[in-house]
Amino acid sequence: MSTTGNIAITGIPTTAGPDGSFPLRRELRDLQRNYPDHFNLLVLALKDFQALNESVQTSYYQIAGIHGLPYKPWNNVGSNSDWQSTSGFGGYCTHSSILFLTWHRPYLALFEQALYNSIQKIANQFPQGPLRTKYVEAAKTFRMPYFDWASQPPSGSSAFPSAFTAPSLQVVDVDGKTKSTANPIYRFVFHPVNPSPGDFPRQWSRFPTTVRYPNPRTGQSQDNRVAPILANELASLRTNVSLLLLSYTNFDAFSFNRWDPNMTPGEFGSLEDVHNEIHDRTGGGGHMSSLDVSSFDPLFWFHHTNVDRLWAIWQDLNPDNFLTPRPAPYSTFNSTEGESQTKDTPLTPFWDKSATKFWTSEEIKDTTTTFGYAYPETQEWKYRTGSEYQTSIRQAVTTLYGTNVFANFAAANVQARATEHTELIKSLSLAAPPPSAPITAEKPLLITQEMKASPIPEHLQHLAPNNKYPEWVVNIRAQKHGLHGAFRVIVFLGPIDESDPDSWQTEFNTVGRVSVLGRSTQGPTTTKCAKCITDAADELMISGTVPLTSALLQDIVNENTASIACSQRKWCRI
């Protein structure tokens, strides 16, 4: 294949500091509050990046389009005959596959390096003198921020950062004056929606901008609905993330959600499963809800940067565990269905630094510094030994996501009583009429957790003899494309108003859900994703988990033990 014009994916070119350090990707709220110069550059540069002509290969539109629609080859990477869908080019999809995490890392690096071009451009447009010097210096250490949706928001902050919901922001513009500007983190404005006729079907071409929870009558984005839903599921998210990072030791189980009949009961959850729930809960039927178009919403990039961060944390805790070779369940540009999919499988369409071959999973797994960045938790250069480094990571994880459910619960109740608000945060869902599909609710899983920190309140000690307690979760598996679109499996502990699905978003007895990002494979909304069409024909099954222990503890403390009875356990799919 000719390499003429191949775009090398380098990330932001960086050399390590004298102490081995690399610039950090920081949490968005931390960046906005504590690194205002970096945040100012982010807003101005992202706006500049989004304004690039949509025909430019490194434009926001073209890079977002790699993920799904408009399903066109990118960076001189076409497809072989085995990979063509009936409607043409079949895309680069790696969802529900062993390459899910590794494929998205160079994808993020590409986005970051394209954004960084605008960062440098903007920094050098400030008037010469101290102002330009300040922003040029800030640009050197700018890295793409992440949105940590599983940690407790800073005091006074929303579960959904205001940067995602404010139509405009105050910035110091390149003329040195403070002014209001349209917020590029809030939404992406297509210019136009269909730069080439047919890029988007009517389902999406009717939206001139990305939307979240679109009003069914007007199509207007209802971003105000996201924060309460994220807040109500925070306890469940924290538990899931803590379990994944500290209890999962097998990369295949940790990384992706394809169900395997050889799975153990403790392997039904995955980072992809949690990732899907954020797409679902923030999208609400808008762009983030559909993998065909989710990457056009600016939120996608902050969300996936956090997914990459969680993988980096897990990988450094489990450095000797990586993907297991397995037959490719579908055909891609570089492999045919049935061929072995390994750590050396090319991650198309991402050319490496030489621009002559593609990145592989093996080349990018060990360290994020390959692409010039690190995370606050992965500053390995600060520690003398690997053991000290891993200890610091575990401490960071327990600080952010809790040491154990009992400790989290006790802390939440202390805070709740102080504010005269006794409801624990619980996960909710977007309501819709429940269709039918083959879905299996597995028996609740009992995992024994040993608590290594935070004493148990005396009135709960009988529930954790010998400082151990059962971690209850519901294991769920479902046919991914069985409903020809996205759906959720919701778990309740206790009665609900089954006649009013809209109320499920605020039901106290709603515990959590597994979000299934299926795609339509029939009718006018049929996806062009070749892998998805193959997966649907093969009746691909995926799995996920819903933690129960926090909800059970809440009922015990409230002396509402009826919810524990089998007759009160409910689940529903919508």
UniProtKB/Swiss-Prot annotation:
Residue sites binding Cu cation B per the record: H275, H279, H304
Annotated function: This is a copper-containing oxidase that functions in the formation of pigments such as melanins and other polyphenolic compounds.
Known EC number: 1.14.18.1
Catalysed reaction equations from the record: 2 L-dopa + O2 = 2 L-dopaquinone + 2 H2O; L-tyrosine + O2 = L-dopaquinone + H2O
Gene for this chain: TYR
Record family assignment: Belongs to the tyrosinase family.
This protein's UniProt keywords: Copper, Melanin biosynthesis, Metal-binding, Monooxygenase, Oxidoreductase, Thioether bond
Cofactor(s), by name: Cu(2+)
Tagged with keyword Coiled coil: no
Transmembrane regions: none
Cross-link (2'-(S-cysteinyl)-histidine (Cys-His)): C93-H95
Annotated cofactor note: Binds 2 copper ions per subunit.
SUPFAM superfamilies, A to Z: Di-copper centre-containing domain
Entry keyword annotation includes Electron transport: no
An example molecular function term from Gene Ontology annotations: metal ion binding
Organism for this UniProt entry: Podospora anserina (Pleurage anserina)
GO terms, biological process: melanin biosynthetic process
Protein name: Tyrosinase
Binding, Cu cation A: H67, H95, H104
